[in-house]
Amino acid sequence: MARTPVRQHLVEKGTQVFLERGYSGSAVQDITAAAEVPKGSFYNHFESKEAFGGQVLQEFFSDLQRTISSTLEDASVPPVRRLQNYFAAIIETLDGQGCLIGNFSVELSPLSDVVRTELLRIFEQWVKPFQKCIIEGQETGSIRRDLAPDLLADFLIASWQGAILRMKIERNREPLDQFLTVVFEALLPSTENISNES
């Protein structure tokens, strides 16, 4: 811990506490206990638990953006494969506690304007690389063209979050496998004959 700034250490440990207990089930004392720092240290860095939650979301999405960069934005890989690589990478990191973005969306968006504003910002940024990837797939004929890229991108994220929620409830990954089957075998594939395209 000596090499880790207290603020960042609190965020890292707080993320785990929120994933395990939820926002409402986590007290500041739980977070400081997990981080093994005095409670006063928390308020030296964060104005409130709500502000801390917003910061945790920012950090969580920053980590997610690294996965986005290495998968969805990898131009050396065909668009559909990029999408598959993204979901495969996320599945590797899931441990049954779900996605913090989805968890906070369900639990806090009706209660906290601070968190809701941060969630809106995150979803706005999150959808863009999906849209870009889908557009490229439509241009090459590997993804259906009869649905708008923004509609498909929004649906992918929304249905993925729903699959993660089901995974938490059922305590197995079958909902994730069902999502992948429907998306990549039924929803996205183009029915066009690519060889006849000019």
Swiss-Prot record:
The keyword Plastid does not apply. It comes from the Bacteria. InterPro entries: Homeodomain-like_sf, HTH_TetR, Tet_transcr_reg_TetR-rel_C_sf, TetR_C. Transcriptional repressor for the dhaA haloalkane dehalogenase gene. Pfam families: TetR_C_13 (PF16925), TetR_N (PF00440). It comes from Mycobacterium sp. (strain GP1). GO terms for molecular function: DNA binding. Keywords: DNA-binding, Repressor, Transcription, Transcription regulation. Residues 4-64 form the HTH tetR-type domain. This is HTH-type transcriptional repressor DhaR.
